[in-house]
Every structure is written in C-alpha cells, then in structure tokens.
Amino acid sequence: LQSDGDIVDLDNASPVSFSMPADNYFVAFRSRNHLGVMTASAVALSGTPLALDMTTGAVATFGTNAQKVIGSTRVCWAGNVARAVQNQLQYIGAGNDRDPILVRVGSTTPNGVAAGYYFEDVTMDGIVSYVGAGNDRDPILVNVGGTTPNNVLVEQLP
C-alpha cells in the first residue's frame, strides 16, 4: 500500500499478481495499521491487470461503514495498532490502540518520538508521536467518534 492509496507489487510500481486460476473472487486487503476492506461481491480476475478503485464508492464494500469518507474519497480506517485485537479500533479499555503508541515513544516521556516503520505510526509519516501536532493518537479518537472515546469500530471482513 503506497501513501497515495495505490496497492502495487513489492517493486513499488507493478500491479499485484496472484498465481490463481481466472475466476470470480472477493478482493480484500488490509494494511499494517488500518482496518481491512473487501468487495461486497466477487470480481472477475484473470492474468490481465485490473484497476479496482475502492476510493470512489463505485465498488461496493462488504459490511457497514467499512471505509471512512474524507471529502469524496473513501479510505481505510486508520489506527489498528494493538495487534492483540486485530479487527477493531478502540481508544480506551483493555487492548486499546492508543496505549501502544505511548509505549513506543517511551511510556514515561509522552512527548518523545520514534522514527521508523512501526505499527504505531497511524499517520504513516515515519514518526510515532503521542502528543503535539500530527500525533498518532488523535486519529484513533476521531475515527471511533471523537466525543465518545469508548466507541469501538469493528473491521468489516467476514
């Protein structure tokens, strides 16, 4: 998954290919710290590359509230940091997605940062931060509802 939302092969350019017979398949994907998304119906796949744009709403997705809408673009819900509970976003309570961010930056120093490729990097900017502008904690709170931090957002995969 690239920062612009494209899903490409490991060379960062080629389409993703699967060594499977041509047929109709449900297409699902998930990224390191986002909730997964799946097509609502099977898609015809073959050896010919297919552009499957799930950002416009033209391709229906499985479940309810499977994607976040920003303007007119549909994106994956960000913040699935706590890998103990792989299928939901949760801001408070046991197994929440907020606490691992604090642990990554050093627990006792919430104003610290950690640079690198980490699950806790919700904003995918290469920096994990718990406080301050562009921190990785706030998007989780916003995604679960903002004013109700005890809400849980469940991934829409079977």
Where are these regions (language model features)?
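Cellulosome-associated attachment modules in secreted, modular CAZymes
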Residues: 1-158
